[in-house]
Each structure stands twice: as C-alpha cells, then as structure tokens.
Amino acid sequence: MKTTKLLIPTQKEVPNDAQIISHQLMIRAGLISKLASGLYSYLPMGVRVLHKVENIIRQEMNKSGAQEVFMPVVQPAELWKTSGRWDKYGTELLRFTDRHQREFCLGPTHEEVITHLAAQYLRSYKQLPMNFYQIQTKFRDEIRPRFGVMRSREFIMKDAYSFHLDQYSLQQTYDVMYQTYCNIFDRLSLDYHAVLADSGSIGGDASHEFHVLAESGEDTICFSDESNYAANIEKVSFLKQEKTCKSTLTEERVLTKKKNSIEEVAEFLNVNKSDCVKILIIKTKDGFKALALRGDHELNEIKAHNLFGNFEFAIDDEIKNLDLKKGFIGIKDLDIDLIVDYSASVLCDFVCGANEWDYHLMSVNWQGIEFVDADLRSAVEGDYSPDGKGKLIIKRGIEVGHIFQLGTKYSSAMKVNVIGESGKAITTTMGCYGIGVTRIIAASIEQNYDDKGIIFPQAIAPFQVVIVPINYNKSTRVKALSDKLYQQFIGAGIEVLLDDRKERAGIMFADSELLGIPHRMVISDTHADNGNVEYKARDKIDKMQMKFDDALSFIQFKL
C-alpha cells in the first residue's frame, strides 16, 4: 500500500480530552476519530489493527472447538425480563420502544439471546458440550465514558457461551478456554496476569479475569513474587490468625485533642498506624454494625457486601444517635455488633478511640470484648501470599478478558433443557467467556510506546514494514529502488507501506514512528550510490546498513 492512497490523518497536538497515553496516540496516529462521547470511528489504519486482533482471537477460538455465530445487537425486552435482568441491570442498559410500542434494548452482553437460541436447538445430551462465540458490537450507556476506547459506550467484544450436561464437563471447557485466552494474549505479546475475580453483574461461580499490567489500569491486582497465585484485590482472602497476645501493660487514657484521624493520632502518640485500631460504622438490613480494622488497612467493600449484603456507611447524625463520637470511636461500650478483621483481632497493646471527645486509649487489648472476627480488609503490598508462597506484589491492571462458570443461572431462567440419557429433562449448566477486542488495542499501546509514538507488537501492527524513500518524487534512482523493494516485499506476502508523499524526511520518519510500524527501510541517493539500504527496528535506537539485495531475506528473517 502507498501512503498517498491511504487516509492517515496524523497530528502533532495532543487532544485536550485525551487523559491516557493510548487515547492520545490512537487519535494522533489517525487510528480512530471521535464522533461523540464514548463513540469512535475506526479509520483505515485502526481497522487494520482491529482485524489483526480479531483474526488472532478467531483462530484460537476455532482451534479450541468453539463455533462462531453472530447475534443481533438489538434485543427484545421479553428475554431480559425472563432472565430477571431488565430491572436489575440499571441505566447502562439502553432501552427503547419501536413504532409498535414494543420494548427493546441495545445489547451490552448476550446471555439472554444465546440461551434463547440454545433452548430452540439443543434437545439431547448427545449434542453437548457446545461452545458458541461471536465477535460483535456491544453498547453500555456509561455514565462517564473516558480513556478513549478503553471505556467507551460502543465497543467490540468476543463473547462465548458454553452449554454442558454437568459441572465436570463445564470445568473441562473452562480449562480449555483459560488456556485459549493465554494463547491469545501470548500471541498478542501482552504482559498479563490471569487472576481470581468477582463475577459482578453477570453472576455465577468460579471466575478469572485477565489483566494487562499498566499504570493507567482501573483495577488493582495482586500476585505472588514466588508462585502463580494472582487475584483481583477484591478476591484476596486472608486466614484467621492465631492469637498470641501476652500483655503486661496497663491501659491508659490519653488526651488527643482535635486528633481524630489515624495519621494524626499515630504521629501524636509516636506509634505506628499498624498498632492502631480504627472503627467504621455501617448500616445494613440488620441494623448498624461496627467494623474494626488495623489502622494501616482499608475496608474491602466487596468482602463487606458478601458478609452483610447491601450496606451504607453511617452518616454523622446516625453516628451521633448511636451515642458515638466520630473520630474517637473505640471497641468498648458499643451497643451494636462488633466485627473485627483477622489482622486487627491479633493485635496486642494497641491504640483506639475512647468513645469520648478528644480522648484515645493506649495499651488496649481484646480481653473481655465481645466480637466476631472476619476477613474484612484489602490486601497491601508485602502481605504474605494466601497460598503460603512468597509475598504479594500489587499492580494496576486493565481487564481485557473475563471467564465465568455461570452454572444454571441463565439456563434455568430461560429453560435451556435437554433430554438426558435416562429420558428425563436436565437443565444445562453454562460457561461465559469474554474478551474486549477494542480494549486490547488500547491496552497494548499502554504497554508499548515511547516519546515518539506507538511501538506495536509485530502481530497487530497495521503494516509489518515501511519503506521511507528520501526524495522519492525527485530522484529517479531512489524511486526505482524503492518501487523494486516494494514489489519484492509484496511478492513475498509482506505487508508493506511505501511512503510516497512529497514530504520532508523528518515528517515521514516521525509518522512511521508514531504509527508504530515494527520495521523501517530507508533509501536515499547516498544509499543508492553504495547499493545499500538503511534498516531500523521501531523498538531499537541503532540503525544499520545492508546491501539492497539482502533486504528481502533480512526482513523475512525478522518476521
């Protein structure tokens, strides 16, 4: 392909609304164009990258034995009402009414549609297991679309759904899909971790997320420095610890006037935050609860939700009505249930509030205090790994894939039953497997860039090689050699871009680097005099000269 025949609207300026590097570079490199908030058009270079990502996914999914289907984006409300999600899904579900006053939605996911389809055509246990996938547009009416295609309203996903006779069969397919996802992300050259995860609004049992490591990631993931353990911070669990407190100190009431935060109290009393206990008051369906955590730990709200159901933090007036002093709440004289995090329950001679304005207690212990201990906190860097091997490292991650064991949540609601070997109807059990196709492009850029632009992995670069001829439109020798090399590459099946524009060399170099094309060949009159071409890899600083006749074999070796 020649540059003059392509739309590549590169730009120097960083868009004002582009906060993260992938958004900035995708706009600047002319991969995408913003239509409205959370809506983007893919331009020719972006489409080339998108298709390469899709092709890798499609190849690996086909290899796994999954069958490709293609389902409508527009979905009837009846299906969502049958599954129970029409009211539960919330405002992200874009609903509308057609001219006949029938309700529909734009699909953010396709569990309802695939189960409706399966209920029509899966009749016998002999047909199972079956795994269907599609690569399709989704729509979620995000309240705050941001970060370009990372969190847009319209996006492309690969979603797959498997149907099984029993849990054993589901586990087999789940394991196959886990490995398939690893194969996909390996081929995409992503630095990723598969982590234990929460099932979220889709629901279900076992669940893994696949996260690309990047500082711009919205999720926090934890992994061991010595083992394969990895989990979303929401899912890192801690075991109950043995209590070994043998205190010989006397409890002391101290004046801490106007010092009502852990940081202020610890500094004032010259103690570590880890030697303090803080109390949070929450409101649940069963009334108010007091949660005690170590001063340097934070409440994991997912764990709290799993323990208490929906809850809210108590507001100032509610705390006052409980006869508690905000900022000075302690573990004594509480008239509400006290739940203590495991790590706080083993503290000895600690600091906590005195339930009295401007006072704290020192050398406090748990003897005589009625409480229940539980796993309440979020992990912190340096915690021992839950598998007992090594310590936890905490990084930011971009979720690019998620696999679930759904069980019978949807197949039961949608009546996806088959006749078993005994002749009786059996409700199928399901798995669900998603990959954010468009998000992968942004995630890859977040890991592969420099101050000049994108450094695409070879597998998804828009072109494999760019030829940059100096004075292509002025020097007949340069034009002849460039055209010859261009034809050689095309003949060898190499995806090559020839920059035939009437531009300065600096502009052509800058654009090729911005676009992230892995290999660059430069031809000038000087090179022609010596029968050479100049080669530079996008991810390297050094350049090298080689004979023109060796250029094709050299690139073939690199590819």
From Swiss-Prot:
The lineage of its organism: Bacteria, Pseudomonadati, Pseudomonadota, Gammaproteobacteria, Candidatus Pseudothioglobaceae. Keywords: Aminoacyl-tRNA synthetase, ATP-binding, Cytoplasm, Ligase, Nucleotide-binding, Protein biosynthesis. The gene is proS. Belongs to the class-II aminoacyl-tRNA synthetase family. ProS type 1 subfamily. Consists of three domains: the N-terminal catalytic domain, the editing domain and the C-terminal anticodon-binding domain. It comes from Ruthia magnifica subsp. Calyptogena magnifica. Its main location: cytoplasm. One of its GO terms (cellular component) is cytosol. Catalyzes the attachment of proline to tRNA(Pro) in a two-step reaction: proline is first activated by ATP to form Pro-AMP and then transferred to the acceptor end of tRNA(Pro). As ProRS can inadvertently accommodate and process non-cognate amino acids such as alanine and cysteine, to avoid such errors it has two additional distinct editing activities against alanine. One activity is designated as 'pretransfer' editing and involves the tRNA(Pro)-independent hydrolysis of activated Ala-AMP. The keyword Transport does not apply. Homodimer. It is found in: Cytoplasm. Its EC number is 6.1.1.15. Pfam families: HGTP_anticodon, tRNA-synt_2b, tRNA_edit. It catalyses: tRNA(Pro) + L-proline + ATP = L-prolyl-tRNA(Pro) + AMP + diphosphate. Signal peptide: none annotated. It comes from the Bacteria. One of its GO terms (molecular function) is aminoacyl-tRNA deacylase activity. GO terms for biological process: prolyl-tRNA aminoacylation. This is Proline--tRNA ligase. The keyword 4Fe-4S does not apply.
